[in-house]
Amino acid sequence: MDSPFKPDVVRGQVALITGGGSGIGFEISSQFGKHGASIAIMGRRKQVLDDAVSALRSLGIQAIGLEGDVRKQEDARRVVEATFQHFGKLDILVNAAAGNFLAAAEDLSPNGFRTVLDIDAVGTFNMCHAALKYLKKGAPGRDSSSGGGSIINISATLHYTASWYQIHVSAAKAAVDATTRNLALEWGTDYDIRVNGIAPGPIGGTPGMSKLVPEEIENKTREYMPLYKVGEKWDIAMAALYLSCDSGKYVSGLTMVVDGGLWLSKPRHLPKEAVKQLSRAVEKRSRAKPVGLPTSKL
């Protein structure tokens, strides 16, 4: 699908994307690169990184892969420093690394709960903390007239209500959203850094979708989604581009929901025509009923 953005909207910028070697993270890496940015992707699996970098470079995108675990502060610092040393600056940080699996709360070990919190919530803060020195206004490599950089945290909508078998992810993403809002307040005020989030819904062709949503459940989910379809990785990448380029220059502290309206939706228990018939019947009975005298003793 063609992009609605001009091909140079992030030209000359440098973006570091955690989890950028696969799924949504790779699509964001690819679209940022196609729109002019230089790309550093971070991940734990060397082969995935190598394949992703090769794919990006085949498109004419300047890209490097950096091994690291977002849970480790030393890895976060090392990857940020390596990005700066290679490209000379850092403009955009996208925290897309995430952990997820299904487990009933009673079957989920404290270690399993902690692991997802560490990847999603602690990992997001580790990367933000390490990147601050290069994202803030007036940082090395930054034009003083251009202001600060931009951070995008990939979240979810699971914690907006409650979700079956994902208490660990719900807790982690709630923490990510709180981090987004608080950093937008503090770092926007002190360092001119914009901080936003994106909460994807079901996105086809991703490891998370294949792991968490079997085909039978996906088909059932479509029945009560307002748009009757799952999203594409492209949808999330376009949201990330909007938040990173000048089109989103006055947006900060927002977690943008990109889920086709799914989290707002509920199964339709009555067809629309049945509702009309029921309403007419109720109205008819109401008019036929004698008004009578008030029966209250008050």
From Swiss-Prot:
One of its GO terms (molecular function) is 2,4-dienoyl-CoA reductase (NADPH) activity. Its EC number is 1.3.1.124. Keywords: Fatty acid metabolism, Lipid metabolism, NADP, Oxidoreductase, Peroxisome. It catalyses: a (2E,4Z)-dienoyl-CoA + NADPH + H(+) = a 4,5-saturated-(3E)-enoyl-CoA + NADP(+); a (2E,4E)-dienoyl-CoA + NADPH + H(+) = a 4,5-saturated-(3E)-enoyl-CoA + NADP(+). CDD domains: TER_DECR_SDR_a (cd05369). GO terms for cellular component: peroxisome; plant-type vacuole. Substrate binds at residues 44, 71, 101, 109-111. GO terms for biological process: fatty acid catabolic process. Residues 279-298 are annotated as: Disordered. It is found in: Peroxisome. It is an enzyme of class 1 (oxidoreductase). InterPro entries: DECR2-like, NAD(P)-bd_dom_sf, SDR_fam. A motif (Microbody targeting signal) lies at residues 296-298. SUPFAM superfamilies: NAD(P)-binding Rossmann-fold domains. NADP(+) binds at residues 19-24, 69, 173, 200-206. Its main location: other. Auxiliary enzyme of beta-oxidation. Participates in the degradation of unsaturated fatty enoyl-CoA esters having double bonds in both even- and odd-numbered positions in peroxisome. Catalyzes the NADP-dependent reduction of 2,4-dienoyl-CoA to yield trans-3-enoyl-CoA. Belongs to the short-chain dehydrogenases/reductases (SDR) family. 2,4-dienoyl-CoA reductase subfamily. This is Peroxisomal 2,4-dienoyl-CoA reductase [(3E)-enoyl-CoA-producing]. It comes from Arabidopsis thaliana.
